[in-house]
Amino acid sequence: MYRENTKEIAIGNVKIGGTHPVTIQSMTNTKTENVKETVDQILRLEAAGCEIIRCAVPTMEAAEALKEIKKQIHIPLVADIHFDYRLAIAAIENGADKIRINPGNIGSEEKVQAVVDKAKEYNVPIRVGVNSGSLEKHILEKYNGVTAEGIVESALDKVHMIEKMGYDNLVVSIKSSDVLMCVKAHELIAKACPYPLHVGITESVSYTHLT
């Protein structure tokens, strides 16, 4: 199988991209503020082979909980941020090994710049995440709806914004609940930028739910 030679990125003590093997990441479904429940779930995931863990950070209390969670686990911790740039900054300050943001819902470029500056200070990678359900109006109009090309254009716009801010410690995530569209989008973006890709399917459900 052909593989793009992407930029090497360090997430804590785990390296991705370049010639490194694909790593397995999962996400907790606990309230991150509940340190014990979150740690217990992460340790079970570690035992099952998880190599990187992501936690939702919807509140400042959750951001502050990352510091204690980090002390009790053995794999890199990623903070999943939506809407409030201050949570991204707090997550980095409390030990997140990587943050996931969608610059399109963080707010103004000044707010994105504040997050980038903090990531630079701590040398923390940023995962730029875009999904098919959050495409900008002008992209939807240009491509007459949701398309792989539109998803890629939206993601590249955000990547280029952060590059212009002087930061390239990046991972890119593009997601769609349409599997074939998702595959095509990944093929397109792999040729368009040098960063490693986080591969996942949005709106995923359990097997028991499907049956």
Named regions from a protein language model:
Residues 2-14:
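N-terminal basic/disordered segments at the start of proteins
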Residues 3, 27-29:
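N-terminal capping/lid subdomain adjacent to the active-site entrance of alpha/beta enzymes
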Residues 11, 16-23, 30-55, 60, ...:
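Alpha/beta enzyme core
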Residues 70-79, 193-201:
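Short beta-strand/loop segments at the ligand-binding rim of alpha/beta enzyme cores
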Residues 203-205:
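Active-site phosphate/pyrophosphate-binding segments
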Residues 208-211:
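Conserved small/polar residues in nucleotide/adenosyl-binding loops
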